[in-house]
Curated annotation (Swiss-Prot):
This is Peptide deformylase. Keywords: Hydrolase, Iron, Metal-binding, Protein biosynthesis. It comes from the Bacteria. Belongs to the polypeptide deformylase family. It catalyses: N-terminal N-formyl-L-methionyl-[peptide] + H2O = N-terminal L-methionyl-[peptide] + formate. It comes from Desulforapulum autotrophicum (strain ATCC 43914 / DSM 3382 / VKM B-1955 / HRM2) (Desulfobacterium autotrophicum).
Amino acid sequence: MALLEIYQYPAAVLLKKALQVETIDDTVIKLVNDMGETMFEAPGVGLAAPQVGQSRRIIVYNPQAGSSNANEDTKEFKALINPEIIASSGSIVSENEACLSVPDYSCNVKRFETVTVRGLNLEGKKLEFDAQGLLAVIMQHEIDHLDGILYIDRISTLKRNMYKKKVRKGLTNH
């Protein structure tokens, strides 16, 4: 396994819809394993393929994130290929949502409390499950990445423009 570069806003790959995975082959499996290692090293609770420069509909996530079962020593992750949210309910505000591709910034984002997610596992088996709480937030956040949507696209225009101004200023200072 290898650590991958995490692309940061405003990288073009983050701003466009990722391509469906047609075949789960050794290249996809290697990418998933590298993404899992990169996610834990960052550290994060989820990572989408566009965040590592790959326009593919793949996410990895820590299923224990926010759980009382979470063990810092266990680097277990799960992968979803071509995931989609097929139902949602409830409404919560995720507190201090952050993103590895949007450094040094966190904010509240309105997210659904429960989502039903459908996708494939690495063996190509169809999965469908309900995610609640933090896992629901992770699913919405990572699947947004696959659609070219960053969490800063889901906040007020004022806050988003302030962040973009900060990024532009940082880019011109280098």
